[in-house]
Amino acid sequence: MSAKAIIEQLKRLCVLHEHLLTLSEEKTEALKAGKTKELSNILTKEQKYIQAITQTEDDRIKTTSAFLGYSENNTISACIAKTSGSEKEELEQLYESLSQVLGRLKKVNEMNRQLTRDALQFISISYDMLVPKENNFNYSKSIKAELPKSSKMKLFDSKA
């Protein structure tokens, strides 16, 4: 069996991940600029790419399993070891390319996570500063009325 189907799926995965990387970089700029509508559109597009990546990856796993004879080690490295010639070189190049794109995507997503966390912290702090605290430390009739009668101290006990 030829590794052509695996090569085609890896090419598709590389393209999809590169598009996802571009969207993640756009998301970084939208987060920095505070553009919520643009961010919402980007998230919708990201979901579509994630679904396509998931489907392609499932297909790749099935194809890899069939190519390797349904072994437990259904990895691209195992496919590279089983192939030779131009297919082997192409698989190695695609593997390296996909690894690099995934590494960059991981870094960009980590930065986006940090930007989102910082924005949420800022919103939380701003909200806490604008909203008054519920605890009122002033004396009032309501506090006096809540005290039980037995806890009142008397200076002079007339029954003694």
From Swiss-Prot:
Disulphide-bonded residues: none
Gene Ontology terms describing biological process: bacterial-type flagellum assembly
Species of the source: Bacillus subtilis (strain 168)
Lineage of source species: Bacteria, Bacillati, Bacillota, Bacilli, Bacillales
Listed InterPro entries: FlgN-like, FlgN-like_sf
Swiss-Prot/TrEMBL keywords: Bacterial flagellum biogenesis, Phosphoprotein
Gene symbol of the encoding locus: yvyG
SUPFAM superfamilies for this protein: FlgN-like
This protein's name: Uncharacterized protein YvyG
Modified residues (Phosphotyrosine): 49
Function: May be involved in the assembly, structure, or function of the flagellum. May polymerize to form a filamentous structure that is part of the flagellum.
